[in-house]
């Protein structure tokens, strides 16, 4: 058994939403978490900048002798996961979008109207839509960017009227105009406001990729042990 730690990284605090699921389902695993709070948010930065930051962090994690890198950041996963795999072929590198897309495609019924919310970079990449519809073309996918969410969450502005009003600003028209029945939290920061979203839109089915990725991590560990 490989007892080395698993490396997680994100642009800031968002990737921490994966950790409780890891501790519950894979309690024997050690974790190194790198949150780039000095340079957050990534969601409005240029692709080359995101790629450069991600290479630096992955290099740090590889030098820390991790056995796997988990990109607990949708923006990075949408931008440069393949670049990271080419740069560091010696260890598995797992992005968060593919496991989430697989789960969405497999669990949502035909004709479901699925809304993806995320950063500007994630949404403009179309990564979720492509990955989901490649597996289940009968699903209707709609996407919208919510760029103010991450800065507010990083500042701890969560359980108050400011966050609720911001959620409604981005999501009211999006949900109504597209008749959305399912929302995918396409940024690992967004589980911090999942309770807000569920309270404001009680009829929505909410899918949280931060809880889904653990199953794929387990599969990779089992394959390599």
Where are these regions (language model features)?
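Non-catalytic structural scaffold of enzyme domains
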Residues: 1-225
């Amino acid at each position: 058994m490989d007892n080395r730690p698993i490396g997680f990284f994100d642009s800031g605090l968002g990737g921490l939403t994966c950790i409780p699921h890891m501790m519950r389902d894979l309690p024997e695993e050690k974790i190194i978490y790198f949150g780039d709070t000095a340079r957050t948010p990534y969601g409005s930065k240029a692709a080359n900048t995101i790629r450069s930051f991600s290479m630096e962090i992955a290099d740090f994690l590889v030098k820390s002798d991790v056995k796997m890198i988990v990109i607990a950041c949708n923006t990075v996963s949408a931008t440069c996961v393949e670049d990271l795999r080419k740069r560091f072929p010696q260890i598995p590198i797992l992005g968060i979008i593919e496991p989430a897309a697989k789960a969405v495609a497999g669990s949502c019924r035909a004709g479901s109207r699925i809304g993806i919310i995320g950063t500007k970079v994630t949404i403009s990449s179309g990564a979720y839509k492509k990955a989901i519809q490649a597996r289940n073309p009968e699903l209707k996918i709609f996407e919208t960017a919510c760029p103010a969410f991450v800065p507010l969450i990083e500042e701890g502005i969560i359980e108050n009227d400011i966050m609720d009003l911001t959620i409604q600003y981005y999501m009211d028209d999006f949900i109504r105009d597209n008749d959305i029945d399912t929302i995918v939290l396409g940024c690992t920061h967004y589980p911090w406001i999942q309770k807000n979203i569920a309270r404001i839109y009680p009829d929505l089915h909410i899918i949280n990729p931060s809880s889904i990725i653990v199953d794929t991590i387990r599969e990779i560990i089992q394959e390599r042990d």
